[in-house]
């Protein structure tokens, strides 16, 4: 563990929780996909989860299980080939549930597919597009404002296809047989 991340005298449980969070944080996960499965597998090391999967298209009350989304890589490059945005460095940079894309776009088109938080100019927002097929990136407002006119290469290596919604169930035995 890096020194200085936790105060002296912090309990072992707190240290373990912190290490678990450090392990889980980098995993890109959404409501479906391999990131959810990877997260649940790690959590199974700590608690006995029962894993369930529901196929895409299944109706559950007033909701339909969406297609499964997985992402492998994404970036924005400038005309010189420099990566300005890199999913491998920060998975917040991709609009969650983005469709795959690999093309060159103008700054105006890029801006039309970019989410920012002008009121928090140095924050990268978390945005999703579960129910409207689209592609996009999330940048800090400052970073977007610094982009010059020109052509940009946008690349998102993702898939959106029939699959499953995966979830974990953990049963905590109580003092009565009631369940909620």
Predicted regions and their residues:
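N-terminal hydrophobic/helix-forming segments and targeting peptides
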Residues: 1-180
């Amino acid at each position: 563990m890096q020194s200085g991340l936790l105060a002296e005298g912090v309990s072992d449980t707190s240290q373990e929780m912190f290490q678990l969070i450090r392990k889980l944080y980098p995993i890109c996960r959404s409501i479906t996909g391999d990131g959810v499965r990877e997260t649940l597998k790690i959590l199974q090391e700590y608690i006995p989860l029962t894993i369930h999967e529901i196929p895409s298209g299944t109706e559950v009350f007033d909701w339909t299980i969406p297609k499964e989304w997985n992402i492998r890589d994404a970036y924005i490059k400038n005309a010189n080939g420099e990566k300005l945005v890199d999913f491998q460095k920060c998975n917040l940079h991709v609009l969650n549930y983005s469709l795959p894309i690999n093309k060159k776009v103008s700054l105006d088109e890029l801006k039309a597919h970019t989410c920012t938080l002008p009121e928090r100019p140095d924050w990268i927002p978390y945005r999703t597009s579960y129910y409207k097929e689209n592609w996009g990136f999330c940048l800090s407002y400052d970073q977007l404002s610094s982009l010059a006119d020109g052509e940009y290469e946008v690349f998102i290596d993702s898939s959106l296809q029939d699959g499953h919604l995966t979830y974990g169930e953990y049963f905590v035995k109580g003092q009565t047989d009631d369940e909620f």
